Amino acid sequence: MRYDLVIFDNDGVLVDSEPISNRLLAEYLTEVGHPTSYEESIRDYMGSAMHRIHDLVLERTGERLPEGFDEVFHGRVFAAFERELKPVAGIVEVLERLVAAGVPYCVGSSGSHERIRVGHRVAGLDRFFGEGRVFSAEDVGRGKPAPDLFLYAAERMGVAPGRCVVVEDSPLGVRAGVAAGMDVLGFTAMTPAERLVGASRMYAEPGELVELLLG
C-alpha cells in the first residue's frame, strides 16, 4: 500500500538517542533514590513523555521526583547529544527516497519541541524537518499510548488516519498508532518484535523500511 503520510517517531527511529537518554535516565533516577538499571529504563520508560515517567515513579514508590528533575535531566541529555548523537544508520537515505518520491512525512514524538530541534540539528536532520513537519506530545493533552499525537499530526497535514503509516520502535508508540487507526511499522533494532505487538509489519534495517514504504 502506498501511504499519503508517513509519521516517524523521533527517538530511536530518526536519531539514535535511546541509548544516550536511557543511560542518563537510569543514572539520574538512581542518583535521586530510585535505583534503575539501563535495561529497566529501556523496558519501562522508552517512548514515554516526561509526565508519564513522573506518574510511573509515583505509582511504584509513592514518592514524587524532585522539583527541577526535568530541567536537570534535559540539560544532561542535550550536553550528551552534542558529544554523541548521530542519525539512525540509513535513515538519511530513507528520507531522501521519500523526498524524491514526493511522499509527505512528518515526525510525531513524545519528546519536547526543544529536544527534537536539538537532536535534529546535531544529527543533521533539520534539513528534512522544516516548519509544519514536527509534532510533539507538548501539542496535545495526552501523549502515547493515547492516539492524540498521531491524530493531531494527520489533521495538521491534511491526511485521513487510514491513509497514514506510523514508524515506531516502542510498545507505547505502536499502541498509539493502532489506536489512531493507522498502520504501524515496528523497528526492532532496540525492541524485540514480541514487544511491538500490533504493528502491521516489522523491520530491522532502514533498507527494509524503504521497501515497506515505497515497495
Which residue ranges define each predicted feature?
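A generic short-segment signal for beta-strand/edge and adjacent turn/coil regions
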Residues: 11, 21-23, 41, 73-76, ...
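Asp-based, Mg2+/Mn2+-dependent phosphohydrolase catalytic module
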Residues: 1-4, 96, 112-215
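N-terminal helical cap/lid subdomain that shapes the substrate entry/recognition surface
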Residues: 2-101, 117
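A generic secondary-structure micro-motif detector
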Residues: 15, 43, 84, 106, ...
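Conserved phosphate-coupling serine/threonine residues in phosphotransfer and NTP-handling enzymes
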Residues: 13, 109-111
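Residue-level detector of anion-binding/catalytic polar loops
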Residues: 35, 104, 183
